[in-house]
Design a protein with these regions (language model features):
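Surface-exposed repetitive/solenoidal architectures
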Residues: 1-2, 34-37, 214-216, 252-253, ...
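Structural signature of tandem-repeat unit edges
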Residues: 1-7, 15-29, 39-52, 62-75, ...
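Active-site-proximal loop->helix
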Residues: 11
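Consensus positions within tandem repeat domains that build extended binding/scaffold surfaces
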Residues: 32-34, 54-59, 77-80, 99-102, ...
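Alpha-helical elements of the RecA-like P-loop NTPase motor core of helicases
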Residues: 249, 293-294
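A structural signal for leucine-rich repeat
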Residues: 273-276, 296-299
Length: 316
């Protein structure tokens, strides 16, 4: 028997929920943390009339295998289903956005996003290691930062060319990598398996936005060069094609990179890219390229760090 605490239509808490849980009629909202950590709860039936599911409402319910969400739900809060055990879920048609971290670290394998959804939130599916297929609506406008980061098995996703995609949104979604190991979506290159295979990373021609050009980890990698013995080391050099128009601050996240060669006139502004210091010594740009005033002066500390970088202009 599950004992519910309900206040003004909001289900605030369920004491020691186990097995199959049926939420009472008359409830209009599931409160924040209402079922947090209920690992012995296997299924949940939410009745019609519920309009809102609060923040972390079902967070860390690792034993939860199925949940019924009624068509009346229009709002799902941050981290509502973080670390949940279900593999599929049917979302209500009136839902207009997928909030921050809603499904991150969950056991989802596939999901279809309702037609009214315009935005997929920050870290909404991050770390869903078993997620393979996502069906996006045609009217989707924005996929925010880290939305699908580290969904290693994701291999099927339909993205319109006019969708705005945030920083690191598909980083290390290895199932989306091309035959050369690069993850390129709408001409944006994200952190890819190819960047973990060699000390010299050459971004493919046709890429217009560089989200990542080097691995995000700070540890040494094992490189497997063709015809050579495995080598342990860091990514040391990045080559950017002439097609590049934008280089995001996330492009060079760690300090072991020594050289950047750009065939593009796009501005290389470091911004927050090297927050722990850098070994960068040289940047080579094509003749005629222009740098913005004080390109490395994000703050006084950065300006001092980058004072020794050699910038060379030459025919590339």
């Amino acid at each position: 028997m599950n004992d519910f605490i309900i206040q003004d239509g909001v289900l605030v808490e369920c004491e020691e929920p186990t097995g199959d849980v049926v939420i009472p009629e008359g409830v209009t909202a599931i409160g924040s943390n209402a079922f947090w950590g209920a690992r012995n709860m296997h299924s949940v039936y939410i009745p019609d009339g519920v309009k809102k599911i609060g923040e972390s409402a079902f967070g860390a319910c690792s034993g939860l295998k199925s949940i019924r969400i009624p068509h009346t739900v229009t709002s799902i809060g941050t981290d509502a289903f973080v670390c949940c055990g279900f593999e599929t879920i049917e979302l209500p048609p009136k839902l207009s956005s997928i909030g921050e971290g809603v499904f991150r670290l969950s056991n989802l394998r596939e999901i279809s996003i309702p037609d009214k959804v315009k935005t997929i939130g920050y870290k909404s599916f991050k770390g869903c290691l078993h997620l393979e297929e996502v069906k996006l609506p045609q009217g989707l406008k924005l996929i925010k930062d880290d939305a699908f980061r580290d969904c290693h098995k994701l291999k099927n996703i339909n993205i319109s060319s006019d969708v705005e995609i945030g920083w690191s949104a598909f980083g290390m979604c290895n199932g989306l990598a091309d035959e050369d190991g690069f993850i390129i979506i709408n001409r944006i290159v994200f952190e890819s398996p190819a960047m973990h295979r060699t000390a010299i990373v050459e971004i493919p021609d046709g890429v217009e936005i560089v989200d990542h050009a080097t691995p995000s980890g700070d540890s040494e990698l094992v490189y497997y060069e063709k015809g050579k013995e495995p080598v342990t080391g860091f990514c040391r050099k990045v080559i950017l094609p002439s097609s590049v128009k934008t280089i995001r601050p996330t492009a060079f996240p760690w300090g072991n990179l020594v050289e950047i060669v750009s065939r593009s006139n796009a501005n290389i502004t470091v911004g927050l890219s090297f927050p722990w210091g850098t070994k960068l010594k040289k940047i080579t740009l094509p003749k005629g390229a222009e740098l913005p005033p004080n390109p490395f002066s994000y703050n006084a500390e950065y300006a001092k760090t980058f004072a020794g970088i050699k910038i060379v202009f030459e025919s590339i």
